UniProtKB/Swiss-Prot annotation:
Heme binds at residue 348. Its EC number is 1.11.1.6. GO terms for molecular function: catalase activity; heme binding; metal ion binding. Keywords: Glyoxysome, Heme, Hydrogen peroxide, Iron, Metal-binding, Oxidoreductase, Peroxidase, Peroxisome. It comes from Glycine max (Soybean). InterPro entries: Catalase (IPR018028), Catalase_AS (IPR024708), Catalase_clade1/3 (IPR024711), Catalase_core (IPR011614), Catalase_haem_BS (IPR002226), Catalase_immune_responsive (IPR010582), Catalase_sf (IPR020835). PROSITE patterns: CATALASE_1 (PS00437), CATALASE_2 (PS00438), CATALASE_3 (PS51402). One of its GO terms (biological process) is hydrogen peroxide catabolic process. Transmembrane segments: none annotated. This is Catalase-4. Coiled coil: none annotated.
Length: 492
């Protein structure tokens, strides 16, 4: 028997119990002891192996997005956008690409309820003919801060207090009181949208600004939008308490059960595009992740549909070991100078290497479905069998060559090295417009949630005053409403 023709299998098709090395086990119920009642012997390798494997079953959970659920399906192009991008998987209507999607909460632990007020992750991995494309977004279109330098501190503030492991409003409000750019995100998080009914009844967004490049090398900025065909549904406070109290995994179960019943969730993909030559024509910076692009002047363009029609086969292999990274793009899609995106390009891959090891892209859920070739090899948990003698490039013994060149954004970068903010902050206009677009009862719920948060006894008068000032600058009536319930005079 040639051992190299017999690869490790996930089928586990032996008719009897074995050790990891394949040795037969005749008793998987009893330890090896001295007599019927004697001490257990250390030589019971089967017991030692079984316990050692059990002790190492858990891997580090994601530092954010730990609680999640995945499903598989396909993406189908419905509208031609080849004038915008040379991406092969978007080449023509009718083209289908297999995908795996992971939905998640963001801040709380792996076993936390799915009814907490928290953004929801919406990450899509496209297995294209030109490699994988990871579109890693959320159910809300903007973010709290615009520069990734603040991201670790932001997560620390949102996470539980390190002293008592309790998430506390005073820490959150203290941190974000230094960053009025967060107001727009809070108009989503403290809105009814802050607690989706489940994963099927919410939209998704790429959040960051990317770039599309066509065959001629023309580049445009792009925002990605997923619109659910099931309609948006949310849970108000009393509903969330009831649902979460009955089943802390309700959204995971809803996704699984819906797909199992043939009720496949579906989203339509739209894009917004801006010519980089026109980026100075707006009262906001198109690369500012705390801003939305007004749809009345930058309309949504339809692209395709996402259908989830298959449940995952194994939660650990296809959810816990599933890894996304915004750096993973394909020809025709590229990054922008969005400061948060630039930070995520490094941070996500670095986090996955810590969590899963340097060869995490060899795991079946993360590996490309197309042919691939490079000299990245060895390292911890490398399980690809390779027998080549040439592991360098170039070589006259190996015919592998460079791929055909594909266009990337032609923009020229120049300027001084400096640490500074963007010029067009405009932190209050869009939050105010969003608040004024709501019905009165929705406005009241939003204000009440802020009053409740600011009523935390450890929130100081100074912090309350800062937030009332911020909301007054967004909308004077909102600031007055919050202040009146707190008996604090607006200071603007």
């Amino acid at each position: 028997m040639d051992p190299y023709k017999h690869r490790p299998s996930s089928a586990f098709n032996s008719p009897f119990w074995t050790t990891n090395s394949g040795a037969p086990i005749w008793n998987n119920n009893s330890s090896l002891t001295v007599g019927a009642r004697g001490p257990i012997l250390l030589e019971d390798y089967h017991l030692v192996e079984k316990l050692a494997n059990f002790d190492r079953e858990r891997i580090p959970e994601r530092v954010v997005h730990a609680r999640g659920a995945s499903a598989k399906g396909f993406f189908e192009v419905t509208h031609d956008i080849s004038h915008l991008t040379c991406a092969d998987f978007l080449r023509a209507p009718g083209v289908q690409t297999p995908v795996i999607v992971r939905f998640s909460t963001v801040i709380h632990e792996r076993g936390s309820p799915e009814t907490l007020r928290d953004p929801r992750g919406f990450a899509v991995k496209f297995y294209t003919r030109e490699g994988n494309f990871d579109l890693v977004g959320n159910n809300l279109p903007v973010f709290f801060v615009r520069d990734g330098m603040k991201f670790p501190d932001m997560v620390h503030a949102l996470k539980p207090n390190p002293k008592n492991h309790i998430q506390e409003n005073w820490r959150i409000l203290d941190f974000f009181s230094h960053f009025p750019e967060s107001l727009h995100m809070f108009t989503f998080l403290f809105d009814d949208l802050g607690v989706p009914q489940d994963y099927r009844h919410m939209d998704g967004f790429g959040v960051n600004t990317y770039t599309l490049i066509n065959k001629a090398g023309k580049a445009v900025y792009v925002k990605f939008h997923w619109k659910t065909t099931s309609g948006i549904k949310c849970l108000l406070e009393e509903e969330a308490i009831k649902v979460g109290g009955a089943n802390h995994s309700h959204a995971t179960q809803d996704l699984h059960d819906s797909i199992a019943a043939g009720n496949y969730p579906e989203w339509k993909l739209f894009v917004q595009t801006i010519d980089p030559e026109h980026e100075d024509k707006f009262d906001f910076d198109p690369l500012d992740v705390t801003k939305t692009w007004p749809e009345d002047i930058i309309p949504l363009q339809p692209v395709g549909r996402l259908v989830l029609n298959k449940n995952i086969d194994n939660f650990f292999a296809e959810n816990e070991q599933l890894a996304f990274c915004p750096a993973i793009v394909v020809p025709g899609v590229y990054y922008s100078d969005d400061k948060m995106l630039q930070t995520r390009i490094f941070s996500y891959a670095d986090s996955q290497r810590h969590r899963l090891g340097p060869n995490y892209l060899q795991l079946p859920a993360n590996a490309p479905k197309c042919a691939h070739h490079n000299n990245h090899h060895e390292g911890f948990m490398n399980f690809i069998h390779r027998d080549e003698e040439v592991n360098y490039f170039p070589s006259r013994y190996d015919p592998v060559r460079h791929a055909e060149r594909f266009p990337i954004p032609p923009a020229i970068c120049s300027g001084r090295r400096e640490k500074c903010g963007i010029e067009k902050e405009n932190n209050f206009k869009q939050p105010g417009e969003r608040y004024r677009s709501w019905a009165p009862d929705r406005q009241d719920r939003f204000a009440r949630r802020w009053v409740d948060a600011l009523s935390d006894p450890r929130v100081t008068h100074e912090i309350r005053s800062v937030w009332i000032s911020y909301w007054s600058q967004a909308d004077r009536s909102l600031g007055q409403k919050i202040a009146s319930h707190l008996s604090t005079r607006p200071n603007i």
